[in-house]
Amino acid sequence: MGKCQVISHPLIQHKLSILRRQTTSTKDFRELVNEIAMLMGYEVSRDLPLEDVDIQTPVSKTVQKQLAGKKLAIVPILRAGIGMVDGLLSLVPAAKVGHIGMYRNEETLEPVEYLVKLPEDINQRQIFLVDPMLATGGSAILAVDSLKKRGAANIKFVCLVAAPEGVKKLQEAHPDIDIFTAALDDHLNDHGYIVPGLGDAGDRLFGPK
């Protein structure tokens, strides 16, 4: 069974508290999502493979380390996942970026996929699948399904806030997937929103649809 790791760094928790506030502006919300994603990236990328590389410093030749093989692929679930991409790219600028577009049917609460654009070599890359929220788990499960259909095997799901119901569903559907979150909240309400959560992340990042 994949792990669910809550990254409880003090800076992340402080910024997440500001992010949750109803009065936080769109500008500040966007910046905070970017900053939290970057801070989480250090932990999420902890097991990236390294290889030796010969370099010349101003003083001497030396053998040092660099990321090995194919670099990351960062795949946001549209639209809210876009807000996390730049923070992760600031750590690994060579990463490729794909997109999986989904929206939620507000009556059934089920996700509907409308776009899949991925790097051609997605099956050779470690993937950070990103979405600020893991609520019902439906979008995450469908996105992982899409990635696996295209040969992807090394996938981590990265979110800012998760509900226990969504974590359980994702782990049951894809027990090989590790989940990284800045907070594991209490529950989902009758409308499928995380409580206490932070509202509709897409609307708070980009404005109402």
UniProtKB/Swiss-Prot annotation:
The keyword GTP-binding applies. Pfam families: UPRTase. Allosterically activated by GTP. It catalyses: UMP + diphosphate = 5-phospho-alpha-D-ribose 1-diphosphate + uracil. Binds 1 Mg(2+) ion per subunit. The magnesium is bound as Mg-PRPP. Its EC number is 2.4.2.9. Keywords: Allosteric enzyme, Glycosyltransferase, GTP-binding, Magnesium, Nucleotide-binding, Transferase. The keyword Nucleotide-binding applies. SUPFAM superfamilies: PRTase-like (SSF53271). Its cofactor is Mg(2+). Catalyzes the conversion of uracil and 5-phospho-alpha-D-ribose 1-diphosphate (PRPP) to UMP and diphosphate. Belongs to the UPRTase family. This is Uracil phosphoribosyltransferase. It comes from Streptococcus pyogenes serotype M49 (strain NZ131). The gene is upp.
